[in-house]
Amino acid sequence: MAKIYKDEDISLEPIKNKTIAILGYGSQGRAWALNLRDSGLNVVVGLERQGDSWRRAIDDGFKPMYTKDAVAIADIIVFLVPDMVQKSLWLNSVKDFMKKGADLVFAHGFNIHFKIIEPPKDSDVYMIAPKSPGPIVRRSYEMGGGVPALVAVYQNVSGEALQKALAIAKGIGCARAGVIESTFKEETETDLFGEQVILVGGIMELIKASFETLVEEGYQPEVAYFETVNELKLIVDLIYEKGLTGMLRAVSDTAKYGGITVGKFIIDKSVRDKMKIVLERIRSGEFAREWIKEYERGMPTVFKELSELEGSTIETVGRKLREMMFRGMKQISSH
């Protein structure tokens, strides 16, 4: 079973007198910077240029610095920019400007696990991966709560890397919910697998296939949309709140029986075998190499798919129905 740490198990002492540089001020960067500061820690914000993020950091009471200047004074350097930006940031603005022995911290293991960034041998390298978007990390902290997180250690030169990772998790509020000890390998591979097989890839293709099947068989697109897209949120919310058995107990007996019997027919052994192929592509680094090439070419596959999807029937119908539903909700809220 996983090792889970709670707020009372963790001390801020290992990072109390450290300067923490948050690189990036987007969704996670802003949440981490504000939460760590509110926890009484010394935070600086490092950015590549003076833009919207720079102005927002100033509005939040920070004095942002250029990345090179921030890492030069930091004891702990936290990468909170997108995965595919981290390599160039590392090479151009961090590697040759950071203090010797400064810690390198990540919120996702991609660049370290696949050796895209190769850290100095004298640095502690660790990860804190909150299991929610940045705005929720911030909002839950302000309400006195927190979101769960994973922590992992890649290099432990000081002998205190785990304690520092846990302290940061406490500082951003995650320990209030619970912090699970993991590894860079486990976090990276499971995160990519989840995105590809269910959260983005799997669910999107299942939605499209079910919608298109109904429309091809003569059902009205608007009705098909409600049944295959709109009602999905109701089911996911039930699973989120009550688990799979709680969801099954909450739906009708007809839905229960149909879902239990037909679900196994749709997601059969052949689908599970494909999932194992996907997992092996991730483990071997094949997906990472493919994605890096795609990114370096300007993401033609991604933009082609987005363009085709945007003009599809499911999206055209969806835009119309969402406008209709939101208009109805606005009318209710105005009364």
From Swiss-Prot:
Swiss-Prot/TrEMBL GO biological process terms: isoleucine biosynthetic process; L-valine biosynthetic process
Function: Involved in the biosynthesis of branched-chain amino acids (BCAA). Catalyzes an alkyl-migration followed by a ketol-acid reduction of (S)-2-acetolactate (S2AL) to yield (R)-2,3-dihydroxy-isovalerate. In the isomerase reaction, S2AL is rearranged via a Mg-dependent methyl migration to produce 3-hydroxy-3-methyl-2-ketobutyrate (HMKB). In the reductase reaction, this 2-ketoacid undergoes a metal-dependent reduction by NADPH or NADH to yield (R)-2,3-dihydroxy-isovalerate.
Protein name as catalogued: Ketol-acid reductoisomerase (NAD(P)(+))
A GO molecular-function annotation: magnesium ion binding
Free-text comment on the cofactor: Binds 2 magnesium ions per subunit.
Residue ranges constituting the KARI C-terminal knotted domain according to the UniProt record: 183-328
Binding positions for Mg(2+) 2 per the UniProt entry: D191, E227, E231
Subunit structure of this chain's protein: Homodimer.
